Amino acid sequence: MLMFDSLNRHMLPPYGCDWVHAPNFQRLAERACTFDRSFVGSVPCMPARRDLHTGRYNFLHRSWGPLEPFDDSMPEILKNNGVPTHLVSDHYHYWEEGGANYHTKYSSWRISRGQEGDPWHGDLTDPADYPHPNTDQTQRPPERLRQDWVNRAHMQNECDMPQAKTVAMGLEYLERNHACDNWFLQIETFDPHEPYFVPDRYKDLYDYDFSKINNDWPEYRHITESDRGLTEHYRMLNAALISMCDHYLGLVMDRMEQLGLWDDTMLIVNTDHGFLLGEHDWWAKCSMPFYNEIAWTPLFIWDPRSRVSGKRCNSLVQTIDIPATLLDFFDIELPEDMQGRPLAATIVNDTPVREAGLFGLHGAHVNVTDGRYVYMRAPANAGNRPLYQYTHMPAHMRKPFSVEEMQTATMAEPFSFTKGCPVMKIDASGGARELDTSGKGSEFYEFGTLLFDIENDPEQKHPLQDERVEKRMIEYLRRAMIANDAPPEQFERLGLEQ
């Protein structure tokens, strides 16, 4: 599996983009099955990866955090059934408090350092080209910005960059183990996640002057007319970084060809979510509704059992289906609590695996799609209450839950998927403000509930007012929440009958 972070579907040639240079993604679409209705589940980074391990949504119960003691982990299940699993990654959130036990589920793992302010090198003097916070890059916390530029000073050549090192480690694993049977390799790079640090040779593919603005790291905020030039700059940088990702995708495909792996080796190419680059007058994610640019994702699967090439599937699939597909490939029974479904039959004949699917962020809109419509249910009150975290692992992205948060903890009855374990119930009003959104108040309430017809309005510019469709989508939402054993107060927060 080759996994990218924040890879935009609408920026790829197989999904209709005619200006981003990414020939290997087109080559991949000709080799594999391309999914046209692939959606996220839980977001952003670590919640998406928890979905990838467990095959079930987690955003209704807690925010960003580690795997829980009761979670089923796909890589660990493979490992325990005699299938060695290996992770190579530069996704530095794995080495932080809020992601600290994902990589340990694999049989073995290797890392490369230096992405997005990763606290890697400890240089006490500023790099020569450091853009001090009185320049174009004022939006970043000074310590994160400085650390990122310190890291860059140690990447003088492309081969020193995290994506290059990560893919090289993955190719090394293939070289050593390609003759063996039954193994799982996850090559996971943080690119094309921001900041958009990219070698010049990929920028040279575009007719654009990248030197005119010294800023490659978008803020998470609403934008105005004065931001249009910077928006174009970010979009071009993102395109150049996608071209870099495309190059390394090509290396993986080339090596599979050289080693004869296409005959018996599944390849999955996926992402966790997308990223807004000015659409809907926003940059980034998490601070706004989860529009298609974020929630509707690229997904490609080559299954050597059926050898389906160049086909497009229109069935609704999600991140939670990937672990189910992998377990099925190795003839391993799916855990009882896994909600994702294997996609083998979908690849062959577009067999549906669900009527509708949930997606969202803890404490924000709860969204449901049937592949035709997207319904975004907003909080029913400006306080966005009641809202709780349910966990045995009280950690945010970069730090533990605060003492004040933990002082609100009580023990709640087990959920259907916690294997008889009661869990801590912690008031989310003291949230850590670390992109998990827990504890935020009126922001999502002010956006209101939204309904879109994404077949006729894929850019979601024209919200629908259709009582009949909304009623059907509410029923999909309610049933999916019940199936996920959502906490009762989530229904109350959204103004829904349970």
Language model segments and positions:
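Active-site regions of oxyanion-processing enzymes, predominantly non-cytosolic
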Residues: 1, 99-110, 116, 143-148, ...
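C-terminal, low-complexity/hydrophilic appendages and adjacent surface loops
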Residues: 292, 362-465
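A long, amphipathic alpha-helix that forms part
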Residues: 160-178, 219-265, 329
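A short beta-strand-to-alpha-helix junction
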Residues: 18-21, 40, 65-72, 232-244, ...
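Polar, surface-exposed loop/tail segments
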Residues: 22, 52, 159, 163, ...
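Histidine-centered active-site microenvironments of extracellular/periplasmic hydrolases
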Residues: 20, 195-208, 255-318, 354
